[in-house]
Amino acid sequence: MEVEDLGQHISRRFNEDLESVRSAVLKMGGLVEAQFDNAIKSLAEGDSELGLQVAQDDYKINRLEVNIDEQCSRILATRAPTASDLRLIIAIIKAITDLERIGDEAERIGVLSSRLAGVERPSTNYRELRNLASHVQLMLRQTLDAFARLDAAEALKVVKADDVVDEEYESIYRQGITFMMEDPRTISRAMDTTWVARSLERIGDHCKNICEYVLFMVYGKDIRHTQLENIEAEFAPGGKARERGS
């Protein structure tokens, strides 16, 4: 085989490896989204069996995380990627950890939903919980879209939306405390509702993390622990950041 042909062969195999691992991440993301949607459906409809099924299916996400991690390790060991390819592999390794943790939180919501099934819930508190769940569902959908398309603008939307989710969680937490103080009989129910809200808030955090990795892939800049106003100044349309292709 000629040297030039060998180089093209190696390059083609490398691209196939990258596409394979990228496809596996998208498959994992789809499974995580399905698990989360089922957990929220269980909560909304009081479906105890569906909530427990979410918990039972969490192992599928864990298995995918291990497989993708092994794929990435092989690529790092055998292909020695550089520049944008290296950023992609690093971001994938980090992103699958956050996806797995979203799966864990979906499992937790499923278990809590099964406990809350058939239990009377305070209308105001539960309405806010459903609003929070809807916002986090949108965040997760936008996160997966941003990752699939390497869409920096969509990723920035998610980073900004996390502050709203945090505020909604704090409101639900304060209401839960109020309910427990006013009527000690509601303590168990209020605690479970608050833990669901806490899991939703954590899922929002993991979505934000993944979108920060998207910005890292596109621009080559690590924005963790950076103030939101500085992120917007850097990455919003007309900002200072420029895409890095190498």
Question: Which residues does each PLM region occupy?
Answer:
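Cytosolic, long alpha-helical scaffolding segments
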Residues: 1-246
